[in-house]
Amino acid sequence: MSAYRRPVALIVLDGWGLNPDPRANAVAMARHPNFDRLMARYPHTTLTASGEAVGLLPGQMGDSNVGHLNLGAGRIVYQTLVRIWRSIQDGSFYTLPVWRPVLDRAKQPGKALHLMGLVSDGGVHSHIDHLLALIDLAKRENVERVYVHAFLDGRDVPPQSALPYLERVEAKLKETGIGAIATISGRYYAMDRDKRWDRTEKAFLAITQGIGHTAGSVAEAVERAYARGETDEFVQPTVIEGVDGRVREGDGVIFFNFRPDRARQLVRALHETAFDGFKRPEGYRPVELVTMTQYDQTFTDIPVAFGPQFVDVPMGQVVAEAGLRQLRIAETEKYAHVTYFFNGGEERVFPGEERVLVPSPKVATYDLKPEMSAYEVAREAVKWIEEDRTDFIVLNFANPDMVGHTGVLEAAIRAVEAVDECLGQVVDALLAKGGAAVIIADHGNCDQMVDYETGAPHTNHTLNPVPCILVDDQRLDAKLKPGVLANVAPTLLEIIGLPKPPQMDADSLLVSNAEGA
């Protein structure tokens, strides 16, 4: 062990919000004896994990990317959603130089501009207002042929809410007179991130070959999907008849999602010369492509509208520079969050940083296996703690969020109960070594599984506060202030005994003697 002599962990119960309403509340309905005993024994408070508190727009729900950025940064990190929104408001969006090549290409004879991305106001991966602004941009630039390839949400917004969003897009296209919606596809297909290439292939074939289900109109496409029992997320790729909006060689393409992870696979299929995810019917066909943000550091030849913002001196760097060992551990669904995002949005591994990736189960939807890989994550973490192999741990339990997204209440309850059991195992191992833990959530989700107004499944995140428990037998009498996610890193540094760097402008949640006086 290090000179600090005890392990300290940040344990993220992803999607475990605190909802005062018990209705369809998986957290309230589940049995969680370990969480309850920790709340009863140790200091605790609540954290705001949405809106301006995490660098989003007021009333905007948080997500895991945003949450882990703020957790590791020790300051509020203003998100890309806000940056784009501000640029639209001040007009600078419409004059970004990055648009020029793709617009010029689309204006060439026989060419078109394709706008593709998630069409909703969920604000997690995209925002419909950004698409509408791009249509306005195309009109200003006299682009005559614009085709929208709309990916349906149903996850960060209600499961059957696509039509009003699509109607807004169609109204804007009619107003400008420059295009049409060419295809629709549920995000399950168009935005897979787990290398399930058969899903990506279906979306790709609809977009580039016009292969898939067909419908005479957008409304008919959605209605037929609902009749097949599909909610928005799972709508099979559908081509709108009478709109030949296939992406052809030399066309211009703007992918307007701002969150990278679920956009990468389709971009690879469209852009890479040596692509092996599936067989493309016509092989590689180059297009003029722009993405809203940097989707991957390996996409060096794809222009981006809003470049990455890096966080100087995140917590992982402070821990590394102190000579301490750190472990990042999660299953596949949240691995990027405890590594890339917690490290400030950069692909970097600090000295002494070890990573353990536990594969997520290969199931169609996680309600089929609510425990996911939580037991394996816990088992591995306990092993590292018992063997004195690490000083600081960042651990994420994905279940409350990922199962919450399915909208299946019974499964979400089982997910919470599985995580509670695993939480107890990890905390007990830490305490046996004289260690400490800060237990939090990065946002809510399974704390509301039904839309209280409509009775439909509620599959998106919530705006509810999240718990924060300081498990430390050396600080049983400590008091914690209410705070935000940015306060967590300074709190952890205080517990470890490391000074907070000046770049972290958030305070520790621990009430000082002066404050308590």
Swiss-Prot record:
CDD domains: iPGM. InterPro entries: Alkaline_phosphatase_core_sf (IPR017850), BPG-indep_PGM_N (IPR011258), Metalloenzyme (IPR006124), PGAM_B_sf (IPR036646), Pgm_bpd_ind (IPR005995). Signal peptide: none annotated. It is an enzyme of class 5 (isomerase). Its EC number is 5.4.2.12. Mn(2+) 2 binds at D14, S64, D442, H443. Binds 2 manganese ions per subunit. It comes from the Bacteria. Its cofactor is Mn(2+). Substrate binds at H125, R155, D156, R187, R193, R259, P260, D261, R262, K334. One of its GO terms (cellular component) is cytosol. One of its GO terms (biological process) is glucose catabolic process. Disulfide bonds: none annotated. Pathway: Carbohydrate degradation; glycolysis; pyruvate from D-glyceraldehyde 3-phosphate: step 3/5. Belongs to the BPG-independent phosphoglycerate mutase family. Catalyzes the interconversion of 2-phosphoglycerate and 3-phosphoglycerate. This is 2,3-bisphosphoglycerate-independent phosphoglycerate mutase. It comes from Symbiobacterium thermophilum (strain DSM 24528 / JCM 14929 / IAM 14863 / T). The gene is gpmI.
